[in-house]
Curated annotation (Swiss-Prot):
GO molecular function, one term: endonuclease activity
Enzyme Commission code(s) on record: 3.1.-.-
Lineage: superkingdom: Viruses
Entry's Gene Ontology BP terms: intron homing
Key words, A-Z: Endonuclease, Hydrolase, Intron homing, Nuclease
One Pfam family named in its UniProt record: I-HmuI_NUMOD-like
Protein's name in the database: DNA endonuclease I-HmuI
Gene3D superfamilies, per the entry: 3.90.75.20, Winged helix-like DNA-binding domain superfamily/Winged helix DNA-binding domain
Length: 174
């Protein structure tokens, strides 16, 4: 097994080529969170601030050649639990989806239903000036404000604090 310091967290955390994440401070291997999408996640902390990372991306960033901006990580065998560096590769989103469809690991109709529901969910956008405005969907807000939908979604999920100075939250029912 090979270990490397996690970029941006040098001296705090390390990742192995097998998908383990180690805390130097505690001297322990950290337990992964596995949400409904099946991708292993890990929370890392530095300077009192926490950030969540997908384990397969950490492994690929540190052990797999070929990274370019915009590429995603593909599990060659389709098994999201297999985060060995030899099972991961950098591909385009299109190739990743094609691979998942050919393996039968992507439920297209379910993915479309989820995307449709999420895209129709009203959000509140807070401008850098603190002004709040409601939008019927993430898509509408992004189109009007010239924002990147993926980054806005990351803020809504708590993976980012803001995007281009804007913060976002889902509108509560009622």
């Amino acid at each position: 097994m090979e270990w490397k310091d996690i970029k941006g967290y040098e001296g705090h955390y390390q990742v192995s080529n097998t998908g383990e994440v180690y805390s130097i401070k505690s001297g322990k291997t950290l337990k992964h969170q596995i949400p409904k999408d099946g991708y292993h996640r890990i929370g890392l902390f530095k300077g009192g601030k926490g950030k969540t990372f997908q384990v397969h991306r950490l492994v690929a960033i540190h052990f797999c050649e070929g990274y370019e901006e915009g590429l995603v990580v593909d599990h060659k065998d389709g098994n999201k639990d297999n985060n060995l560096s030899t099972n991961l590769r950098w591909v385009t989103q299109k190739i990743n989806v094609e691979n998942q469809m050919s393996r039968g690991t992507l439920n297209v109709s379910k993915a479309q239903q989820i995307a449709k529901i999420k895209n129709q969910k009203p959000i509140i956008v807070i401008s850098p000036d603190g002004i709040e405005k409601e939008y019927p969907s993430t898509k509408c807000a992004c189109e009007e404000l010239g924002l990147t939908r993926g980054k806005v979604t990351d803020v809504l999920k708590g993976h980012r604090i803001h995007h281009k100075g804007y913060t976002f939250r889902y509108k509560l029912n009622g």
